[in-house]
Amino acid sequence: MAKQPRAEVTRQVIMDAAVELFDEVGYGETTLTAIIERAETTKGAFYYHFADKEAVAGAIIDEGGVRVEEVTRRITDSSSAGLEKLIRVTFAVADLSTHDRIVRSGYRLRQGLYQISPAGSRSYVERMDHYVKAAHDAVFEGDVCDDIDPGELFELLHTMDLGCHLLSDALSDDLFAHEARAWRMMLRGIVPPDKLPYFQEFVARVARQYAQPE
C-alpha cells in the first residue's frame, strides 16, 4: 500500500528535525528522544517510518544523494564542452551542499557512516559514470591532455571535492573559494598550455556566479 501524503510529511519532518540536531550537536550526541521531541511527533509515528537513529541517518544520506544526482545529471547531460561541465558541476554541487541542509548533512554523515547506508557507495558510482563521460568528452575535444585517463581524473576530482568540503567545514569559510583555488592549481596539470588561459578565466567566471557576499 502506498504511503499517504500525511505520512510522507511526517517522515520529512522527522528527517528535518534530525538534520537540525546533527548540525547542532553532532550525530553521536543526538538521541532518538531528542529527534522525536524536535519533530513534535510520537514514538509510534517515528517507528512507523524508521527503526532507529541510524535509519534516519541512512534516509538523509539517500535523499541527499538523490538531490546531488539530479543536479549532476542535469549539468553533465547538457551540450556544453566536457571540461566546462566538470567545472560547473563541482560548483553547483558545492552550492547545493551550502544551501540544502539535507545534502550538507548527508555529506557529513556519509564521510563517517558509510556502513549505515549503501547510498554512499551507490552515489559514488553514479557520479563516476557522469564525470567519466564528461572527462572522455574533454579529452576528445582537446581540452584535457590526451594522456590523462578519464577514470583517474574522476578520482582526482572526487578527492579534490571532498578536500574542499572538509577544509571549508574545518575553517568555517567560503567553500567556493576553495573550489576555485583547487581548480586553478589542477588545470595546470591537465589542460594543454594553449587552452589554460581560457579555462582559468572560465573557473573565475563560474566562481563569481556563486561568490558569497562580503
Annotated model-derived regions:
Residues M1-V25, E29-T41, E54-G58:
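Basic, helix-initiating cap at the start of DNA-binding domains
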Residues G44:
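Key DNA-contact positions within bacterial/archaeal DNA-binding proteins
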Residues F91-I148, L166:
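Short secondary-structure transition hinges
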Residues M128-D129, K133-D137, E141, A170-E214:
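C-terminal peripheral helix-coil segments that are non-catalytic and often amphipathic
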